[in-house]
Amino acid sequence: MFMASTTSAVPWHLSQPTPAGNGSEGELLTARDPLLAQAELALLSTVFVAVALSNGLVLGALVRRGRRGRWAPMHVFIGHLCLADLAVALFQVLPQLAWDATDRFRGPDALCRAVKYLQMVGMYASSYMILAMTLDRHRAICRPMLAHRHGGGTHWNRPVLLAWAFSLLFSLPQLFIFAQRDVDGSGVLDCWARFAEPWGLRAYVTWIALMVFVAPALGIAACQVLIFREIHASLGPGPVPRAGGPRRGCRPGSPAEGARVSAAVAKTVKMTLVIVIVYVLCWAPFFLVQLWAAWDPEAPREGPPFVLLMLLASLNSCTNPWIYASFSSSISSELRSLLCCTWRRAPPSPGPQEESCATASSFLAKDTPS
């Protein structure tokens, strides 16, 4: 079975091919709705510029920050998240933009397979880097001694490597599903997928939805809840800890510390809500229409709202850099400096613990032995 679409910026295709019959390639190209095609190009162009510009700015701020000292652990994750989102822009949105402009994939079979593989790598990496970042913050807050032993400052760490490794591994089926194939015997070649009838497409789309959206969303939400519980527990009554011992369950020792803890808790709640809500809002419409199209033969695959929603696979890549930058005072200051073109000397880079504020728990991170 061949499933194809020239209107979906996703690593698989759900719409039925443009009717070929015995017409020429030129006749096939004119079968598209010109207004819808223009809307697709405009939307993809906007998304590409937004993703590339947003992540480029944040990555530039990180590089500039790193020149004055080693990266904090959170900087490492944000940097790799920016790289993953830039991969989405370069390997998913940009090829699809060129594809939509010509209506057919223009390139050899090897390029077809490579583009489809890299499109999926970007989707996986963007989601898994957020999950890895959240898991690391959970370890830093709930297991500070373990986090301290691993240290920081390097541009790579185990969660980052695992996120990239799983992204590269889980994307491998794309190399075998897609190829340059003849469009319904018309003589026109396009980059098409072949799925087993009738369950292949449904199984694959459902698997992608689970692995890219559902599982990471549940993991992110669970980690944020555990982080919040850890912070909340630190406010409760408990024995005064021994010197150098854990501080779980102890009250703040001064009004100033209490105010700092309360602010951290409030920031944690905001961070949790922003991460989970934005993640779900960005991915849910896209995967809902994909699952609908895969499971319902009568789905309105060619309707404008349906088609345009299928183009929003990379929407989360537009929001990622701003969410995490807004909760990092160091990155925010660098961004303001870049955007305002004020290249004045910034304050010295804090240690690796500074970026625990990204989970609104700087007060706990400071309990980590140094």
UniProtKB/Swiss-Prot annotation:
Ranges facing Cytoplasmic side: 64-77, 136-159, 220-270, 328-370
> What does the record give under GO molecular function?
vasopressin receptor activity
Can the keyword Zinc be found in this entry's annotation?
Answer: no
Q: Which Gene3D superfamilies match?
A: Rhodopsin 7-helix transmembrane proteins
Residue numbers on the Extracellular membrane side = 1-38, 99-113, 181-199, 293-307
What PROSITE patterns has UniProt attached to this entry?
G_PROTEIN_RECEP_F1_1, G_PROTEIN_RECEP_F1_2
The record lists the membrane-crossing segments as: 39-63, 78-98, 114-135, 160-180, 200-219, 271-292, 308-327
One Gene Ontology term of the biological-process aspect is:
cellular response to hormone stimulus
Its topology with respect to the membrane? Answer: Multi-pass membrane protein
Pfam families, alphabetized: 7tm_1
Lipidation sites (S-palmitoyl cysteine): 340-341
The record's listing under CDD domains reads: 7tmA_V2R (cd15388)
Residue numbers spanned by region Disordered: 1-26, 347-370
Indicate the segments annotated as coiled coil, or none if absent.
none
The subcellular location is:
Cell membrane
Query: Glycosylation positions?
Result: 22
Instruction: Give Gene Ontology CC terms.
Output: plasma membrane
UniProtKB keywords: Cell membrane, G-protein coupled receptor, Glycoprotein, Lipoprotein, Membrane, Palmitate, Receptor, Transducer, Transmembrane, Transmembrane helix
Q: Which ranges are annotated Polar residues under compositional bias?
A: 1-21
> What is known about what this protein does?
Receptor for arginine vasopressin. The activity of this receptor is mediated by G proteins which activate adenylate cyclase. Involved in renal water reabsorption.
Quaternary structure note? Interacts with ARRDC4. Identified in a complex containing at least ARRDC4, V2R and HGS. Interacts with TMEM147.
By sequence similarity, the record places it as follows: Belongs to the G-protein coupled receptor 1 family. Vasopressin/oxytocin receptor subfamily.
Q: What is the name of this protein?
A: Vasopressin V2 receptor
